[in-house]
Amino acid sequence: MSGQADIALIGLAVMGQNLILNMDEKGFVVCAYNRTVAKVKEFLANEAKGTNVIGADSLKDMVSKLKSPRKVMLLVKGGSAVDDFIQQLVPLLSAGDVIIDGGNSEYQDTSRRCDELAKLGLLYVGSGVSGGEEGARHGPSLMPGGHEAAWPLIQPIFQAICAKADGEPCCEWVGDGGAGHFVKMVHNGIEYGDMQLICEAYHIMQSLGLSADQMADEFGKWNSAELDSFLIEITRDILKYKDGKGHLLERIRDTAGQKGTGKWTAIAALQYGVPVTLIGEAVFSRCLSALKDERVQASSVLKGPSTKAEVANLTKFLDDIKHALYCAKIVSYAQGFMLMREAARENKWRLNYGGIALMWRGGCIIRSVFLGNIKDAYTSQPQLSNLLLDDFFKKAIERGQDSWREVVANAFRWGIPVPALSTALSFYDGYRTAKLPANLLQAQRDYFGAHTYELLGQEGQFHHTNWTGTGGNVSASTYQA
């Protein structure tokens, strides 16, 4: 029968399959398609057996089975695969039909596709989908953006299948063009930062001689307080996990992979001129971890400090680590929201920052109680320039900063790398410093490159000094350093 499906989904990897089953469970008829048609038959005969999911053996067949306006969702690898499918779909669709990209696409690609498809009368949505396989099946966080005219058409489906937090759907329209995928990219960057901070806390505790079970207990305590979050919870579970050979974690090779979204966030921060230092360090930490053979060799020839990791009051220091982790986490999110604010300004997106925090409250990897505090901050002050200036977070850092400084200082003394904890502290101190040494930096630039400088109290007026008496008096306009 033609025209019976509410939506089609292309891409039957685990995420795609689980999203289809989620939609089916919520009462929507889904048409499943995969480039390898045999996979469609296999899915219908196994995971989707007994459901209302239907299959298609070609894109033309798939489109014919959709109700109008047609809605087609792609869950395929970002890049050329998305463009290939769009190219094949365009001749089969009509004006007003919707194409949704639910993969990890670069936001610039999403903006480009929006512009191209708008000329053809087609609606395009780039939606972040977070929560992994379990989230896709039972309720992900969804971050749709693109052509806003598509939102009323997909809203009933998206808000039915997404996670809920305090009864509110973890899905709302984000903004035009690539806004949805940009917000998802920042989400993933923050995820990198959260994971790195937790790893540094683990490394310090391990260096202090705590066993896996003791560390698991500590993370369990933290998860019942202000650090309550999915990542803290799974860290506890990972530390407790045993197989036939004992604790598994210590046998896992210490080299971390990455799919690129953290790197995209760091690159975007540089492009927009926003100091998202913690996420950058989290990305570089993964790069450093990949140098396993070099690190093993260096460990035998490069000497560290003679001071061993030990404290007089372990209970207090473990509490210090908790506070350090919490304070650094605040900085990480503050930086992420700074990046979204600057991107929104340049791209003319109308982002709802409180709404974004709510979208991340459930279903996604960075879900935590902490996000409720961020939502409250932006709800009470929609134009808040930085989370650090919100009373709740300002007081939290005031309470925890002595512990934070103690942990970072001791880690340095003991030779334990804490790039995320320390760069967060440096950012905090830099942000609260009224006068930084950038005056010297600008003088240096003027000395060797005649780049000019402004004087205090004379902002907007640019001066150049002939520092040596032998150089010229003309300021530079091309050479930049």
UniProtKB/Swiss-Prot annotation:
Pathway it works in: Carbohydrate degradation; pentose phosphate pathway; D-ribulose 5-phosphate from D-glucose 6-phosphate (oxidative stage): step 3/3
Signal peptide range: none
GO terms, biological process: D-gluconate metabolic process; glucose homeostasis; pentose-phosphate shunt, oxidative branch
Origin superkingdom: Eukaryota
Statement: the UniProt record of this protein carries the keyword Protein biosynthesis: no
Active site residues of this protein: 184 (proton acceptor), 191 (proton donor)
Enzyme Commission code(s) on record: 1.1.1.44
Binding site residues for NADP(+): 11-16, 34-36, 76-78, 104
Any one Gene Ontology molecular-function term assigned to this protein's record: phosphogluconate dehydrogenase (decarboxylating) activity
Binding sites annotated in the UniProt record for substrate: 104, 130-132, 187-188, 192, 259, 286, 445, 451
Reactions accelerated catalytically: 6-phospho-D-gluconate + NADP(+) = D-ribulose 5-phosphate + CO2 + NADPH
Its biological purpose: Catalyzes the oxidative decarboxylation of 6-phosphogluconate to ribulose 5-phosphate and CO(2), with concomitant reduction of NADP to NADPH.
Protein name: 6-phosphogluconate dehydrogenase, decarboxylating
